[in-house]
Structure formats: structure tokens, C-alpha cells
Amino acid sequence: MAHTVGGCSLALIFIIMLLLVKAKIDVCKRGDVTVQPSHVISLGSAVNISCSLKPKQGCLPSSSFNKLILYKFDRRIYVQHGHSLSSQVKGLPLGTTLFVCKLACSSSDEIRICGAEISVGVVPEQPRNLSCIQKGERGTVTCTWHRGRDTHLYTAYTLQLNGPKNLTWQKQCNDHYCDHLDLGINLTPESLESSYTVKVTAINSLGSASSFPFSFTLLDIVRPLPPWDIRIKFVNASVDRCTLLWRDEGLVLLNRLRYRPINSRSWNMVNVTNAKGRHDLLDLKPFTEYEFQISSKLHLYKGSWSDWSESLRTQTPEEEPIGMLNVWYMRQHIDYNRQQISLFWKNLSLSEARGKILHYQVTLQKVAGGEITLQNITEHTSWTWVIPRTGNWAAAVSAANSKGSSLPTRINITDLCGAELLAPQQVLAKSEGMDKLMVTWTPPEKATAAVQEYVVEWRELHPGAGMQPPLGWLWSPPYRLSALISENIKPYICYEIRVHALAGDQGGCNSTRGNSQHKAPLSGPHINAISEEKGSVLISWDEIPAREQMGCILHYRIYWKERDSNSQPQLCEIPYRISPNSHPIDSLQPRVTYVLWMTALTAAGESPQGNEREFCLQGKANWSTFVAPSICMAVIMVGVLSMRCFRQKVFVLLLALRPQWCSKEIPDPANSTWAKKYPIVEEKTQLALDRLLTEWPTPEEPEPLVINEVLCRVTPVFRPPHHRSWSEKGQGVQGHYTSEEDTGYSASSPPPPRAPTAETGQGVDLYKVLGSKGPDSKPGNPASPLTILPVDYLPTHDGYLPSNMDYLPSHEAPITDPLEELPQHISLSIFPSSSLRPLTFSCGEKLTLDQLKMGCGSLML
């Protein structure tokens, strides 16, 4: 079967060769192209190229001539008429150049005759830097060399190795760019001291060159295989003793180790001899991830190092933390006896933590007495608690991992800004790039020597909603008056920066604001309320969102102008620190509608305007405009009322204008002292009452009622205070409810009708008939006869003004009295009727109804 496959392969090769020969014959069937001296020449040599036509291969008999053209690639270089052409060519470049000969029988068509390739190259250079290597004890010998310059020709390299006992190994490299070759033989360890010689020879069409012989022994060329199965062991789970283990080839005598932390770029190197796959490392750091690699060598001076082994990565065990926490605090008063203490601390570095920090222990205690007041364990880097304001307090914070705790950091809780003399001066913040700020200050003028250290504190001024900005701080010695801060610094964010000067248990502070980069704000403030307060306008607004402020805001501007006005708006510029979210304006005119809006400014420019709000100041009249007229009117009124005649008229007018519903009832004469002092005889009164009851009409047959109206003109005047008092006349005013026993009716008078209707067209004063003693009656005679008085008659002796009396019409003519022709007078008072002052009458002992007009609101004579 193998012979059959081999025969088929040979037949296929033979057929391909025949086809190639046939193709060549077919290509050059009209003529030949010859090259002298050779198709391969050295650089700078000349060559002769000839082209000739074969018999009967020229132009047709009708053609007048044969024209042969020689092309170098696609460019004509020579033309000749006839059956042959010959030309010498010089200056050919390195590499291969194609020449083609063509026949032209007419002006348009050219026929390809034949062509030739000429190769230009150089003689091979002597190979240099010949070296050989055998990888591992069971590897094969491989040699490498430097070829030198390119010959641009096909060059063959032959490697020949000569050993003891006339042993020779030879192998040729057919690659065009051959610079290494594997002999495929293994030199065994039994001949470690045997000497070997190797050389390489380069051959091409222009010549050959051989390298210098290279002699070596097995130890010189054998490169051990990299160590494998690397592992590490920590004795007692401690980093103090670490053992690195690996496996090697048997002939290895020397090892080198390198290791480094993962985040480091430099290696720690260790050389060990005859290690036998084991080495102890004593300088590893706790809780650190390391990378380990190992290399091997067979001899101290001969041979080469093996390649580095694959990396081993592992983390060392934890150890107790070292170092102390960097602690800072904030103090805030809540009320008169409580304060809030917020402690902050920074994480320990990996070299200080020496493990995973599980928690922090916080202790607060009073300085006096030293008793522990509060202890807490937290996993965060901050802690807040409320403690009393009494006494001096101190705090201690320590970090703990699985192996132990660090030393506590102790700090006294003092008023950081309580001492004004310790406050640093001229605190400034300047940008130092996209994420850095340089803070500078000057020491306090009067307490420079007392300052023990400075603390620079910063935090974002306007964090997002619901966010607590991280607090950053750093300590600075007293001789350093600047600090470069870069922790949590972002561009286009405003930071509040505070510098504290500490001296024992006292401190002073000063602050500023700064940003690393700034632009004009992206939006303006939003006005949320406009209110009027004491003639001025109070404008309140919402802060611009922190991400749209684009740096520290330096000023706010409030613009306003009248609505529908084309004039330039007025403005008020407010420094940021003075009014963070409200400001009054007192230059607006009352009852004018204004349009208001706001902008904000940073060091880079002004923001777009915020929302517009309309507002009209209602205003209040100036109190001075009312005070002067009021005083004038008061003076005039006092002057007018001081005159008696005007005062009387004014009071009469006021009494006349007083509504009826606000007046109180007139006292009932039936309840007077006179009625009780002179009682009516019971028998006659009873007879009179019986007669009245018998003559009283039934409701079915009402009798017509005739009412005589008595109109009396009166002239009211005020009585002077020197007139005799009411007591001198023996009269008084007293209000009582009229009982049936004190009331009498005339036998000839009809019973009292119902109250008059609205059809009468006027108000009527209703009265009852009053029983009275005659002029001859005496107080000691209770059986004196009943005297029926006229309707219009009222007794004046020890009598009272009537009230709540039914109207009783009179059928008798009014009794004339000489006093009726005299001017009628009445004494008025501004007091209510229930407290009327006693009146003095000039009517003698009798007062008739034609002299008296009584209403619910006045009493006139």
C-alpha cells in the first residue's frame, strides 16, 4: 500500500513538470531571450540581454518590417528592427528584475516573444553570535546565530556539531530567513565535561561564509527547566516564619527567588545554594498579598538560569494592628445643658492595620475623675452622641482585627473656635489643578507662640439631598502655614474650608470657601416667596442645586422693574455670606406691580436668570398723615364741647339718633314710694274694679276706642349744677314692675285696648290710670276714698315716672294749668334711662300729661 502511494506521488510530480515545460515552450515559441554572463549577478554588475526570432516567426510577408522591443517590467528600454536584439543593462537594484521582448508588426499590436528574470544579490556574510542551548536534562540541542545582512538570494545554512570520538551531527536549514536550527540530539549528563564544537555555514549562488567555531560542554549549554509545584507554608499561622517550597531537576545546584507585594513594581531578590526546594522568608508583611517566582541553575559559574517559574500569589496572615488612628471631632450645642459630639477618624493603612479591621472601639469619659461614661463599638469611621455640657470631656478611639487592637488615640473635647485670639488670619484657598486646593493662612497676631498645631478641615458646602458630605482634615505643625488638600476634592464643587489653631485645651478658627475649578452657574435661584414686612419686601429663594452651581457662589443679584416697562431693571447685589436665602428690599413703590427675578455669580460669571415673580406692594398710609388731622379735630371738638349750648345740642342730637332697641324701659310709677306710702282703700278699689270688669266689653263685641293725642312742644335745656337737687323736691326715679295692687282704673273709662297697630302711623306712649290721694289726704288715713285722676295727670309729690303701663284713653278734657304757658324745660343726661338723675320741676305739686312727653328713649317737658 505504501509503494502504491509513493508511485502515485511520483507520477503526479512528473505530469506537473511536463505541463510546466509545455507552458514554457508555448510562451517562447516565437523566439528566445538570453542573458550573459548569468541570470544571477552581484550588486553593481552589468548584464547583456539578447532577443532573437525563430525562423518563420516574424511578421507576415505583407509586412514591411519586424520591430523588436525590450521591456524592463512595463517600461521600454530598447527598440531594434530586424530578427534579433541585443542590449547591455547596468545598475540593476537588489532583488529580481523582469525583462520581456516583444514584436511589433503594426502600429497598434505587439506580440510577446519571450522574457527573462535577473536576480541581483550579495555574497552571504559570516554568521555571528553562534550559541547553543539544551532545555533541561532531556531536551535537544538548539543553536542560534545572527545571519548578517540580507543577501536577496536564496541562501542555505548548514549547522555542524562535532563531538568526542569523532562524532559529527549536521543539519541544513532551507528557510530563506534561517537564523536558528534544532539538531534534534540530546547530550546526556554522563558527558558533563566533554567538549563539543559547532559552526554554521551560509551558501548562495554568489558564494559562501562560515561562522567561527563555538566550543562548549554540557554544563555550558544546558538550561534547567523552571521549578514547579511552588507552595508556601506559614508556621503557627504567623508571618514571622514563612517557608517557600518547590520542586527542581536533580542537577540543580543554585536557585534564586524573587517576591513582591501585588501593588509594588520592584522585586525583592534572594539567591540560595543547594536549597533542595526549600527556603525560609522572614521579612514578609502581615495581611499582604505577595507574588513569588523561582529560577534554577546547574552550576555556580557555568551555564544559564532557567526561565522564571509560574507566579504564586498568596496573602500573609494577620497580625495585631500597629500605629494610631487619626481622629478629629465636631462639637455642637443642642440646648443649655446638652451638646452633640461627632467623632471622625481615618482608616489605618494596610501596613498599620495588618489585617481586616472588624470594628472600632470608642470611649467617652470625663477628664475629672476619669470614670468611663460611655463605650461603643462601631464598624463605621464616625460616631455621634449627645453628652452633658458640664465638665471637661475626652475621647479615645482604637481599631481591632482578629488578632488584637491598636493603641487608642486620645483627644480632649474643647471649644475649637472659642478663643478669638487664636483665630488664624487671612485664610485663602487657591486652585492647584482639577483635584487639589492650596490653603494658606497667617498665624494669629497676638498668640503666635502659643499655637501648638494647626488643623485644616474641609467638606462639601452643598451636598445632595439626604447626603452627609465626607469630612476631610489634616494636621500641620505650627511652623507650616499652608496645606495642599486633595482628598475628596472634585472640580466645580464648592468646599467650606476651616483652619483651627490649637493651644492646649483652647482653640481658634477661621474659614473660607474654595473650588478647584469653576464656571458660571447653569441656572439661577428660584424665588419661592415674596412677602411684605413693615413697608419693605422680603424675598426668599431656593438654593441652586449643588451640581448646577459649578463652583462657589460669590454674590446674588435681585432684579426688578415695573411690569410692561421697557426701562432697564434695577438690581441689588447681595454678598453670599450675608443672606443665604432671603433678603429685604425697601425701594419698591406701593401699589405698583413689579416683575422680579434673580441670578447668581461665581468667579467665572453670572448665571441665567431664574424664575420671574410679580408682586405689588400694598403699603400702609403714613401714620403721620392721620396724627395731625386727628389732633386738630380733637382740639376743635374740645373747644366746641366746652361751650354749654353746643354741648346740649350735641347730646340731644346723639340721644335722638340713638335707636329705640338700645334704650331701657322707663321706671313704673306703680312701684314708686308714693304708691306704697298712700295705699288705695281696698273696698273702693274692689268696687271700682268690679264695675270695670262688668262693663268690660267681650272680645266678640269690641267697643270703638277714641284716642286723643296731645302734642306738646318742648324746649330742652340743661339745668345748671347749682339748682336744687331732686331730694329737695322730695322726688326720685326708680324702675319697678307695676303690680295689679298698685294700679287703679277710672269707673268712667273703658278698659285698656290692645296695643295699637302699625296703621296708626305713629308711636303712642301707653299709660295706666294712677290711683292717688287727694290734696287733703293724709298719710295716716288708709281708708280715704279713691281719687280718679285724669288720664293726663301725674302726681309730682313722691312720684316716679311711669313705665310698662298700658295705654288708657281719656274722655275728659285736659285740665289746663297756668304753667302750660311757661317755657318747658327738661334736664338731660348722657347716662342711660335706668340711671336718670333727679329732675327738678317748676310745675308745683301737680304734673299733667300735657306737660310731659315720655318715650322709650327720652324724657321731655
From Swiss-Prot:
GO CC: one term? external side of plasma membrane
- Provide the protein name: Interleukin-12 receptor subunit beta-2
Query: What are the transmembrane regions?
Result: 623-643
Q: Which residues carry this modification: Phosphotyrosine?
A: Y800
Copy the domain comment.
Answer: The WSXWS motif appears to be necessary for proper protein folding and thereby efficient intracellular transport and cell-surface receptor binding.
Per the record, what ranges lie on the membrane's Cytoplasmic side? Answer: 644-861
Which residues bear sugar attachments? N48, N129, N166, N271, N347, N376
Keywords, A to Z? Answer: Disulfide bond, Glycoprotein, Membrane, Phosphoprotein, Receptor, Repeat, Signal, Transmembrane, Transmembrane helix
Gene that encodes it: IL12RB2
Modification after translation: On IL12 stimulation, phosphorylated on C-terminal tyrosine residues.
Residues in compartment: Extracellular: 24-622
Q: Which SMART domains match?
A: FN3 (SM00060)
Read off the lineage from the record. Eukaryota, Metazoa, Chordata, Craniata, Vertebrata
User: What membrane topology term does the record carry?
Assistant: Single-pass type I membrane protein
* Motif window: Box 1 motif: 662-670
MF-aspect GO terms: cytokine binding; cytokine receptor activity; interleukin-12 binding; interleukin-12 receptor activity
Q: Where is this region: Required for STAT4 binding?
A: 800-806
Known role: Receptor for interleukin-12. This subunit is the signaling component coupling to the JAK2/STAT4 pathway. On IL12 stimulation, enhances IFN-gamma expression.
